[in-house]
């Protein structure tokens, strides 16, 4: 059955899935099972604990077909919730034959505890708990996400869904007072409603303060901007700063001292980096001015700064920046960006967010180590929600082995550098998936499950016992396939970002108006970024640390062919999982197959566009018309194959409306965009016909 655009939201918000219970699962030795003789109880005075009790009651009713009353009095056969100073951190789950006690260190931790109990029962597919006393302390202070259903969209269902998925902090894009990139947004309403569930809120800052810290009256100017902000939003937990969104008139001679859009001299590009993309010698003072302004009006609001934009810089330069960095500003560091990679001896570094990198990059490790030495608190930009720019409009990269390895490296980072805060996803949002499960289960202090057993239980829970082995094999093939992924700028801002809807532009310019060949990709007019982060005229975006594209592409195509082979093997297992899935879990198995199918077709598109570019360039460099026609034949053959790939994608996006959508771009690969792509290729083929005629004009 087809979905309409945005129908996925209803599934996303279904944090208590109905009818999870397996009637054959009973309590074994060392376990208890809740029955209708039990009650759920809590003492008055803790509002989030009360919400947790009622939420757990709803869970049992909806997911376990068990209806239990709420009581205010503790007693036998009662699951009792309480908050006590006797617990320093987290909560204690004490399970006895006739009583369950949950003692939380603070009110909001009661909700975390009942969600953990739900997780345990979901894995068993029954209201069963092991007997014993279990202490659970969160390893991380915050796990932040953006909304999974729309930019800065946080209805009650979204807040509850993200909390059940293991996240506890939300991010809002701040352009001005009650303004984000979409227009008006009542920030205080979001902050207050989130706080009701114990969820913190932070601002992702886009407010411009084009002020040099040494200019006259600088601090007063910062105070005016950020003071007004903090007065209006006294309950905001933190403000996150980032270089590319916070350029300033640096006086560092190594930079242009201007915004990147103005870095020209008499029309000649100034090739020095712009402030915001370079650790300017005066940047620490600039950050300090913002910190002073924020803390003058609210010392409890945290300030963080991301060095995302200059992780490419040499360590000595970054160390100099850290030497002067304000100690009371948190430093945010990206896990994988700028990771060094070689492919058949060529340099192919990671250029942007990707799940293909499960090892921390040199920038991440060196920045964490040097900051920790200097007493600077570090936070990680980590993408543990399982989405990145790998395939820009999907809910999850279904590669649990890669995600788990990343999670385990972050446990080590917590121990080495006290990295206690995670920015789990950028504006591409999150999905309640195996990635969310792994994030929760790897996030406990001094406790880890058997991860292989956990993944099998997750597969059984979501797809059924007979389907689970095939799901595990699909996950393994796809995890291995991600080892052959290409994380270049032209791919992640091109075919990876919008999938098979990516246009194939014939590169010769046949025009009487000398028009640019770049196409403005069609996106919703209200989209946060929309077409601005989609580059449609495919060509290499070169980098000083990267082998040039004409050398890379043959090697990258070979790598992607390996990825395609592994992805098809995983897809075959996903098809078998659909056949074997339990009836009530079959739709979930179909969605896994659809996700794998969409990604497979995105890989094909990326291979095709690299072949397309090479053929276009070779055609234009030909020395004879006959040679050029051979490449033109190849171009038309690639176009025909891509048309079939696009047509094959349409049923997939019709089945799952989350495929082809991303919060900051809105829909970019739904049925409409895929049919647009078919029209665009028709247009390109009219150009190839014209060019073929032009090649033979001299023969007439």
Q: Where is each model-derived feature located?
A:
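Glycine-rich, aromatic-flanked loop segments that form ligand/cofactor-binding clefts
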Residues: 128, 135-147, 152-177, 182, ...
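Acidic, contiguous N-terminal accessory segments
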Residues: 1-108, 123-133
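Substrate-binding groove of N-acetylhexosamine-processing glycoside hydrolases
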Residues: 2-22, 26-28, 50, 73, ...
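Structural motif
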Residues: 41-46, 81-85, 103-105, 147-151, ...
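Short active-site loop/helix that positions an aromatic residue
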Residues: 108-121
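Solvent-exposed, polar/charged alpha-helical surfaces in well-ordered, non-transmembrane soluble domains
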Residues: 54, 58, 62, 115, ...
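Substrate-binding cleft of carbohydrate-active enzyme catalytic domains
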Residues: 144-305, 316-323, 330-332, 338, ...
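Extracellular/periplasmic catalytic domains that process cell-envelope and extracellular macromolecules
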Residues: 33, 94, 138-139, 232-233, ...
């Amino acid at each position: 059955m087809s979905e309409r655009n945005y129908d996925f939201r209803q599934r996303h918000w279904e944090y208590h899935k109905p009818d999870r219970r397996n009637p054959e699962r009973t309590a074994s030795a060392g376990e208890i099972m809740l029955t209708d003789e039990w009650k759920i109880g809590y003492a008055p005075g803790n509002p989030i604990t009360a919400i947790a009790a009622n939420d757990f009651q709803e869970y049992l009713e909806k997911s376990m077909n068990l209806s239990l009353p709420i009581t205010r009095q503790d007693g036998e056969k009662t699951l009792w919730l309480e908050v006590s100073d006797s617990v320093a951190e987290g909560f204690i789950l004490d399970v006895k034959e006739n009583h369950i006690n949950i003692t939380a260190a603070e009110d909001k931790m009661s909700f975390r505890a009942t969600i953990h109990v739900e997780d345990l029962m979901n894995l068993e597919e029954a209201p069963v708990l092991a007997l014993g006393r279990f202490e659970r302390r969160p390893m991380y202070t915050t796990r932040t996400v953006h909304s999974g259903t729309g930019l800065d969209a946080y209805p009650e269902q979204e807040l509850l869904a993200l909390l059940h998925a293991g996240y506890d902090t939300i991010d809002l894009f701040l352009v001005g007072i009650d303004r984000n990139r979409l227009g008006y947004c009542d920030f205080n309403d979001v902050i207050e409603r989130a706080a009701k569930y114990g969820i913190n809120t932070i601002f992702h800052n886009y407010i411009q303060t084009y002020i040099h810290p040494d200019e006259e009256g600088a601090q007063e100017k910062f105070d005016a901007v950020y003071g007004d902000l903090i007065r209006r939003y006294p309950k905001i937990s933190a403000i996150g700063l980032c270089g590319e969104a916070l350029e300033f008139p640096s006086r560092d001679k190594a930079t242009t001292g201007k915004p990147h859009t103005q870095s020209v001299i008499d029309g000649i590009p100034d090739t020095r980096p712009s402030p915001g993309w370079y650790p300017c010698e005066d940047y620490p003072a600039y950050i300090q001015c913002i910190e002073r302004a924020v803390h003058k009006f609210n010392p409890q609001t945290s300030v963080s700064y991301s060095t995302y934009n200059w992780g490419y810089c040499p360590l000595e330069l970054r160390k100099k920046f850290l030497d002067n960095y304000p100690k009371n500003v948190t430093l945010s560091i990206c896990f994988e960006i700028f990771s060094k990679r070689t492919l058949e001896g060529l340099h192919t570094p990671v250029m942007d967010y990707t799940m293909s990198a499960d090892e921390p990059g040199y920038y991440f490790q060196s920045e964490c180590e040097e900051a920790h030495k200097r007493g600077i608190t570090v936070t990680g930009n980590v993408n543990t929600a399982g989405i990145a720019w790998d395939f820009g409009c999907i809910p999850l990269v279904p590669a649990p082995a890669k995600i788990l390895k990343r999670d385990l490296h972050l446990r080590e980072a917590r121990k080495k550098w006290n990295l206690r805060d995670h920015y789990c996803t950028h504006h591409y949002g999150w999905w309640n998936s195996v990635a969310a499960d792994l994030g929760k289960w790897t996030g406990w202090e001094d406790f880890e499950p058997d991860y292989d057993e956990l993944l099998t239980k997750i597969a059984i829970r979501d797809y059924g016992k007979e389907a689970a082995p095939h799901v595990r094999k699909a996950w393994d093939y796809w995890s291995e396939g991600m080892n052959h992924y290409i994380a270049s700028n032209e791919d992640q801002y091109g075919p990876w970002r919008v999938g098979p809807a990516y246009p194939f532009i014939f590169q010769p310019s046949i025009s009487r108006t000398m028009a640019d060949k770049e196409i403005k990709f069609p996106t919703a007019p209200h989209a946060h970024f929309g077409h601005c982060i989609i580059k449609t005229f495919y060509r290499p975006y070169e980098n000083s640390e990267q082998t040039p594209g004409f050398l890379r592409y043959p090697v990258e195509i070979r790598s992607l062919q390996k990825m395609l082979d592994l992805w098809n093997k995983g897809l075959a297992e996903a098809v078998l999982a659909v056949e074997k899935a339990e009836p009530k879990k079959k739709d979930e198995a179909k969605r896994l197959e659809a996700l794998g199918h969409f990604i497979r077709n995105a890989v094909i598109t990326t291979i095709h566009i690299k072949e397309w570019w090479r053929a276009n360039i070779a055609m234009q460099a030909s020395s004879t018309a006959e040679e050029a026609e051979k490449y033109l034949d190849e171009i038309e053959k690639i176009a025909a194959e891509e048309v079939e790939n696009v047509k094959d994608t349409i049923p997939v996006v019709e089945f799952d409306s989350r495929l082809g959508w991303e919060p900051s771009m809105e829909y970019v690969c739904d049925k409409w965009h895929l049919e647009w792509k078919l029209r665009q290729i028709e247009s390109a083929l009219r150009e190839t016909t014209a060019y073929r005629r032009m090649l033979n004009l001299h023969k007439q």
